[in-house]
Each structure stands twice: as structure tokens, then as C-alpha cells.
């Protein structure tokens, strides 16, 4: 069983912001598996489930704000008894140029409040799919930057990155994580 978490903030005003790139990516992956999200208040998230190659996959989008994402993650992790090695978090990363993707297991949170929240409840030995959104320019604050919408060229670049994640997601199911890492880079 896998647990895949897309990080973002709830609400239409945040829908296509840089900070919601995790939501955008997970929605595309869920569509690929012909599944859809439904709200589960007891888990503080939207959840979608599917079975592929005999393996159950649980996808979640926390309905808390980013800095409380751990609340959703711990409730789903505990309910389904999922080990951190089977958890994959998709999130924005300002330390990567727009559209660049990196995959890693464990490590620090890089100041990302969603990851800080998750680390606080399950530790940091889970998998991360980091999608670059670039750094703020012209003295713009980080919070303002990540809560703003992509420009059209940025959005197109990010969607190409998300397409690489989606088209190679099956490698995660096959536990070919190194191959996944290389194909999405």
C-alpha cells in the first residue's frame, strides 16, 4: 500500500498558486487512474483510492492549510498503518528552478512549512517529489511569492514537469525509485 500526498492550500484563491503545485500534480495522477477525490472530514483531507497491479494507492490532499498538513498525514497513516518508506509527498520547492524535479528520501524540510508539519508527526524518513517553482525576484517575500499564481510560461513549464511525474509514476509502484528519479530529472 502506498500513500501519496499532494501539498497545497484549500480554496479557489490558492488553486493555481506556486504553493499548490502538489495539489495540481496529484490531481493529474489521480485522473490517470480514473479515480476522483472525495472529502473525508475525519482525516481532514480529500482522498482518492485505486488499485494498480494489485497494489492499493491512497492519494490525499489535506484540507488544512499547509502548515497543518501533518494532521491529515498522521491520521491517514495511522488508520491504514502505512510505513514512512511507503509515503510520497509532492510539494513545491523554491530552491529548484521552475519546472525542475528532484526525488529524494528523507532529509531536511528546507524551511517548507508543510514538510515541517509532516516531519513533526511522522519523522522525516519518507519520500519527497520536489517540484521547482523558482525563487522570488525584486525583494518579493517568499510567502507572497509562493501564494501568487504562475505566469503563463511558468505554468507551462511546471505542467511539463508534472507530465513527467505522471507518465513515470508506475515506476514507483514497481519500486523502481532510482529509475523514477532519473526519468523525472
UniProtKB/Swiss-Prot annotation:
Keywords from the UniProt entry: Cytoplasm, Hydrolase, RNA-binding, tRNA-binding
> Which residues does UniProt assign to the signal peptide?
none
Which residues are catalytic? 19
- Keyword DNA-binding listed? The answer is no
Its assembly, as annotated, is: Monomer.
Q: What class of enzyme is it?
A: hydrolase
Task: Report whether Kinase shows up as a keyword of the record.
Answer: no
Q: Which GO terms describe its cellular component?
A: cytoplasm
Identify the Gene3D superfamilies for this entry: Peptidyl-tRNA hydrolase (3.40.50.1470)
Give EC number(s), comma-separated: 3.1.1.29
Please tell me where this protein is predominantly located: cytoplasm
Q: Site annotated as Stabilizes the basic form of H active site to accept a proton: where?
A: 92
Q: Name one GO biological process term.
A: rescue of stalled ribosome
Q: Which reaction does it catalyse?
A: an N-acyl-L-alpha-aminoacyl-tRNA + H2O = an N-acyl-L-amino acid + a tRNA + H(+)
A GO MF label = tRNA binding
Name the UniProt record assigns to this protein: Peptidyl-tRNA hydrolase
Q: Which PROSITE patterns match?
A: PEPT_TRNA_HYDROL_1, PEPT_TRNA_HYDROL_2
So what does this one do? Hydrolyzes ribosome-free peptidyl-tRNAs (with 1 or more amino acids incorporated), which drop off the ribosome during protein synthesis, or as a result of ribosome stalling.
Q: Name one Pfam family in it.
A: Pept_tRNA_hydro
* Discriminates between blocked and unblocked aminoacyl-tRNA, annotated site positions: 9
* Cell location: Cytoplasm
As for family, the record states: Belongs to the PTH family.
Q: Where does the chain bind tRNA?
A: 14, 65, 67, 113
Amino acid at each position: 500500500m502506498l500513500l501519496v500526498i499532494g501539498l497545497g492550500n484549500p480554496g479557489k484563491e490558492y488553486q493555481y498558486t506556486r504553493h499548490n503545485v502538489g495539489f495540481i500534480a496529484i490531481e493529474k495522477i489521480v485522473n490517470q487512474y480514473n479515480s476522483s477525490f472525495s472529502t473525508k472530514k475525519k482525516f481532514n483531507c480529500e482522498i482518492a483510492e485505486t488499485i494498480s497491479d494489485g497494489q492499493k494507492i491512497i492519494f490525499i490532499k489535506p484540507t488544512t492549510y499547509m502548515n497543518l498538513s501533518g494532521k491529515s498525514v498522521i491520521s491517514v497513516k495511522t488508520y491504514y498503518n502505512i510505513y514512512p518508506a511507503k509515503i510520497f509527498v509532492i510539494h513545491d520547492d523554491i530552491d529548484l528552478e521552475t519546472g525542475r524535479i528532484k526525488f529524494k528520501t528523507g532529509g531536511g524540510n528546507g524551511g517548507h512549512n508543510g514538510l515541517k508539519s509532516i516531519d513533526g508527526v511522522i519523522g522525516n524518513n519518507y519520500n519527497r517529489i520536489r517540484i521547482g517553482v523558482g525563487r522570488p525576484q525584486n525583494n518579493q517575500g517568499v510567502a507572497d511569492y509562493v501564494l501568487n499564481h504562475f505566469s503563463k510560461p511558468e505554468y507551462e513549464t511546471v505542467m511539463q514537469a508534472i507530465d513527467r511525474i505522471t507518465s513515470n509514476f508506475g515506476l514507483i509502484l514497481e519500486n523502481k525509485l532510482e529509475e523514477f528519479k532519473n526519468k523525472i530529472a
